[in-house]
Design a protein with these regions (language model features):
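Extended, low-hydrophobicity, polar/charged segments
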Residues: 1-140
Length: 140
C-alpha cells in the first residue's frame, strides 16, 4: 500500500490506514554484539528489558539511528522485515497474536502491507516467535 500520508510512526500509519495503532506491526532494530536483529511487535507494545534479556541472554540495545539504514537496508520510519540482508535475524513478538491481520512498513515512510500473521511469518522469513514485550494494559 503506497500512501501520500506519512507512515513513519505507529500513530501516523494507523491514521493513514484507518486502523487501530495495535494493528501496525512495529519493527524494532536491535544489536546483539555485531548481529542486527529485528523484532516485530504490536504497534503500542513496549519491550520489557527483563524479558528481552531472558530470551536473548543480552541487554536490549537499539541500533543507533544513524546506523539503521546501513545495517538493515531501510531508513528509520520505513524499517521492515522485507529486503534486509540475509544475516539479519527476524523475530515476531507474541503481542501480534491478538490480531488476524497486521500492517508492517514496506521499506519507506509512505508504505505498508496488509498481511495475516502466517503471511507475515513466511514473508519475513522469521526465525520464530518471542515474548519480549510488557503486558499491554487494557483501559478500564
Amino acid at each position: 500500500i503506497e500512501l501520500t500520508a506519512s507512515t513513519a510512526t505507529v500513530a501516523e500509519a494507523a491514521q493513514a490506514l484507518g486502523v487501530q495503532p495495535g494493528m501496525i506491526a512495529k519493527t524494532m532494530s536491535f544489536l546483539q554484539g555485531d548481529q542486527a536483529v529485528l523484532i516485530l511487535t504490536e504497534g503500542t507494545a513496549k519491550v520489557d528489558n527483563r524479558k528481552y534479556k531472558d530470551t536473548f541472554h543480552t541487554k536490549a540495545k537499539m541500533i543507533p539511528f544513524e546506523d539503521v539504514e546501513r545495517l538493515i537496508g531501510h531508513a528509520p520510519g520505513g524499517v521492515c522485515p522485507f529486503g534486509v540482508p540475509d544475516e539479519v535475524e527476524i523475530y515476531l513478538d507474541e503481542s501480534l497474536r491478538q490480531f488476524e491481520t497486521v500492517y508492517p512498513a514496506a521499506g519507506n515512510d509512505h508504505s505498508a502491507v496488509k498481511l495475516t500473521l502466517s503471511e507475515l511469518e513466511q514473508a519475513a522469513n522469521a526465525k520464530g516467535w518471542v515474548d519480549v514485550c510488557r503486558e499491554i494494559e487494557t483501559p478500564v
